């Protein structure tokens, strides 16, 4: 191909692509949409940037304004110092005047101090009388604010006096003053304790109606805090000047005062009172024989904090959130303590329920969300409460179930007496009843929590334990049956059939218990977990039904093993004179009678179907008996007689249509192949394969080969016809297996 031709091919291909691609027609639409979205995004970003720049500018202006005021204040203080220095220079006798002024001030201050010292005892007595009168009357403490005012003045006097004494340089003077102020110190401490005690019992004050007392308390706290703020401001300003220029601050009121941090002390009282209440509740739980924890006081106190206290306290205190934080911190601490100790699962469940009520309480009463309060709660699906409860629950359920399972297995293996009988006369194991009573009780408890995380994890744990027990039961049942069928039954305790019947009954009941007990709790599960739990639920129910079916199958295996010796005589020469079929069906009848008395009704129908199928399979297997022979019409007559015996026994309990379908394989195979000749064998074989697609060719050949009413050449020809017919058949092997899939030669495995 030339280069020009190659280029033309490429151009044509590109043109074809451009002509066929529909996206190019919509390209302009996409561009317009992207441009609109970009314009919208740019506008949004621009608006947000403008807001951010505006906020930054306002912040810079505020900082600049504060800096300007600070510089101005320092300048004014510097000017004052300059004026003082200038005054000294302008007036020749200024030092003398200043000295005389200080002497006068000192004399006046000394006179005032002496007067106050003389009146100190009287003043303290007045304050004590005021407080005593209020306390004795159990009133709203009308004198509390006045007493605080007087006491504050006395404290200022004390601080000033002690400060002045420290400047004199006499070591004994401060000690003397301290002794003089001993009564004042005691009164001051008692007053503080009184106010702090009121704060500690603030909820009791509300309940008793002492609202005015609470208002006065917070007025006192606010006054103390205000004095602390003034002192901090003075100290901050003083610290910004050289030591040589701090003289003017010494005369400022409050400079000699000590920080009292009253707001912090009040907060500590709130915390201490809450901690005491929580500790009291915990101790009461430990000492209470019922073992119940009660935290209802939290709701009572927080309701007061949310509705009453905000109107009685300064807004800056944010009293509602303060108490919410205090109580939530105590609640988290209580949970931590419970986890660190050997706490019963019931307490964890109570705490989980309480947290749900706690959140609901906040939604209905608090002016803020519970998630805004620190520290955060531990009630989420990954929180410590759910983890510990589910861990402890699973551990306890595992311990209880292991004990019950081991007890049931011991009873099952020893078989020292008959199984337990329920009110309907059905066999069962006591451990199963106790286990589901325990599970039902626990499910009822967790259902009341309405906590989907707890319910989901607990249900998952329960079903895991159930599935584990199912696996263990399968192993135990398989082992016991193997010993029973090993050929030495004398070494095995009797009664295996009865106990298999009990296990089958119990597991069918368990499937029903699952529907009645666990299924109702799924409405509490979140949709994200429901699918997995329903899958586990279905698997667990199927497991119980499977064990019940295994129990029935193993009972049938025991029956089949009992009749095995009698089956070996079928189709033998003496079978035509005396068939063992009556002995075989009588054995089945005996087992059926035992089962109908002690088997749950729904399971009995399954047992009948399996037993009749087992008889059919065993009968067909007998075709492979050694020396088996089929004498034409005589064999047909005897087979019909055998089938009639079986129908007579099973017909007492099964419907006619079930009986016909059960024994039809014998008729289709034996009666068909025994009645067939060279002309009809193909038709009989075709009818057999139509009804039972998996009927083995070896079984058909065995019947034909053992016919004694035909010559060997004819039999060989019939076998060739059957083989040819079998090869020509188009069979769908994806169909459900029939009873013939279980019919094997004597060397095959037995039905268990």
Swiss-Prot record:
One of its GO terms (cellular component) is cell cortex of cell tip. GO terms for molecular function: SNARE binding. The keyword Transport applies. It is found in: Nucleus; Cell tip; Cytoplasm, Cytoskeleton, Spindle pole. InterPro entries: EXOC3/Sec6, EXOC3/Sec6_C. One of its GO terms (biological process) is intracellular protein transport. It holds the Pfam family Sec6. Keywords: Cytoplasm, Cytoskeleton, Exocytosis, Nucleus, Protein transport, Transport. The keyword Mitochondrion does not apply. Component of the exocyst complex involved in the docking of exocytic vesicles with fusion sites on the plasma membrane. The exocyst complex is composed of sec3, sec5, sec6, sec8, sec10, sec15, exo70 and exo84. Belongs to the SEC6 family. This is Exocyst complex component sec6. It comes from Schizosaccharomyces pombe (strain 972 / ATCC 24843) (Fission yeast). The gene is sec6.
């Amino acid at each position: 191909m030339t280069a020009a031709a190659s280029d033309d091919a490429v151009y044509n291909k590109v043109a074809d692509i451009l002509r066929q691609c529909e996206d190019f027609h919509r390209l302009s639409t996409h561009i317009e949409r992207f441009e609109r979205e970009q314009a919208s995004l740019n506008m949004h970003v621009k608006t947000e940037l403008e807001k951010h720049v505006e906020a930054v500018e306002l912040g810079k202006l505020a900082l600049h304004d504060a800096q300007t005021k600070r510089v101005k204040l320092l300048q004014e203080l510097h000017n004052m110092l300059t004026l003082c220095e200038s005054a000294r220079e302008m007036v020749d006798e200024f030092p003398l005047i200043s000295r005389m002024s200080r002497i006068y001030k000192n004399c006046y201050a000394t006179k005032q101090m002496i007067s106050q010292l003389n009146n100190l005892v009287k003043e303290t007595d007045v304050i004590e009388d005021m407080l005593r009168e209020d306390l004795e009357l159990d009133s709203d403490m009308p004198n509390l604010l006045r007493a605080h005012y007087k006491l504050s003045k006395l404290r200022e006097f004390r601080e000033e006096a002690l400060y002045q004494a420290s400047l004199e340089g006499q070591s004994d003077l401060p000690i003397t003053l301290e002794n003089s102020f001993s009564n004042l110190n005691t009164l001051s401490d008692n007053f503080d304790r009184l106010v702090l005690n009121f704060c500690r019992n603030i909820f009791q004050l509300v309940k008793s109606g002492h609202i005015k007392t609470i208002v006065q308390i917070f007025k006192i706290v606010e006054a103390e805090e205000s004095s602390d703020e003034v002192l901090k401001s003075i100290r901050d300003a003083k610290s910004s000047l050289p030591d040589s220029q701090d003289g003017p601050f010494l005369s400022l009121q409050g400079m000699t005062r000590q920080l009292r941090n009253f707001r912090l002390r009040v907060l500590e009282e709130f915390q201490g009172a809450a901690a005491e209440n929580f500790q009291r509740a915990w101790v009461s739980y430990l000492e209470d024989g019922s073992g119940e924890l009660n935290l209802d006081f939290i709701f009572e106190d927080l309701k007061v904090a949310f509705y009453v206290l905000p109107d009685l306290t300064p807004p800056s205190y944010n009293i509602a959130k303060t108490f919410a934080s205090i109580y939530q911190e105590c609640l988290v601490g209580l949970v931590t303590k419970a986890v660190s100790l050997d706490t019963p699962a019931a307490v964890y469940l109570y705490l989980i329920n309480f947290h749900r009520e706690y959140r609901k309480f906040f939604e209905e009463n608090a002016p803020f969300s519970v998630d805004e309060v620190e520290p955060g709660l531990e009630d989420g699906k990954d929180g410590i409460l759910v983890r510990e409860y589910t861990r402890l629950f699973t551990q306890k359920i595992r311990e209880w179930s292991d004990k019950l399972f081991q007890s049931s297995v011991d009873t099952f293996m020893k078989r020292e007496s008959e199984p337990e009988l329920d009110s309907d006369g059905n066999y069962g194991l006591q451990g199963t009843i106790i286990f589901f009573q325990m599970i039902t009780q626990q499910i009822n408890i967790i259902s009341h929590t309405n906590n989907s995380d707890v319910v989901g994890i607990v249900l998952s744990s329960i079903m895991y334990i159930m599935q584990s027990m199912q696996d263990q039961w399968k192993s135990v049942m398989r082992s016991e049956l193997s010993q029973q069928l090993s050929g030495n039954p004398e070494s095995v305790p009797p009664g295996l059939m009865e106990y298999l019947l009990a296990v089958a009954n119990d597991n069918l009941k368990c499937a029903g218990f699952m529907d009645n007990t666990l299924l109702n709790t799924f409405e509490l599960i979140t949709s994200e977990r429901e699918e997995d739990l329903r899958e586990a639920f279905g698997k667990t129910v199927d497991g119980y039904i499977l064990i019940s079916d295994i129990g029935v199958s193993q009972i049938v295996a025991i029956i089949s093993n009992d009749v095995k010796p009698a089956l070996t005589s079928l189709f033998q020469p003496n079978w035509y004179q005396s068939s063992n079929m009556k002995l075989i069906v009588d054995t089945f009848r005996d087992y059926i009678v035992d089962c109908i008395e002690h088997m749950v009704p729904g399971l009995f129908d399954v047992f009948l179907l399996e037993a009749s199928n087992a008889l059919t399979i065993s009968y067909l297997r007998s075709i492979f008996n050694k020396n088996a022979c089929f004498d034409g019409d005589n064999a047909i007559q005897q087979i019909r007689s055998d089938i009639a015996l079986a129908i007579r026994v099973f017909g007492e309990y099964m419907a006619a249509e079930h009986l016909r379908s059960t024994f039809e394989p014998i008729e289709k195979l034996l009666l068909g192949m025994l009645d067939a000749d060279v002309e009809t064998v193909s038709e009989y074989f075709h009818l057999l394969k139509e009804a039972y697609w998996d009927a083995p060719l070896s079984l058909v050949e065995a019947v034909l080969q053992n016919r004694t009413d035909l010559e060997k050449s004819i039999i060989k020809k019939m076998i060739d016809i059957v083989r040819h017919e079998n090869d020509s058949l188009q069979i769908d092997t994806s169909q459900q297996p029939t009873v013939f899939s279980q019919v094997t030669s004597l060397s095959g495995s037995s039905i268990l």
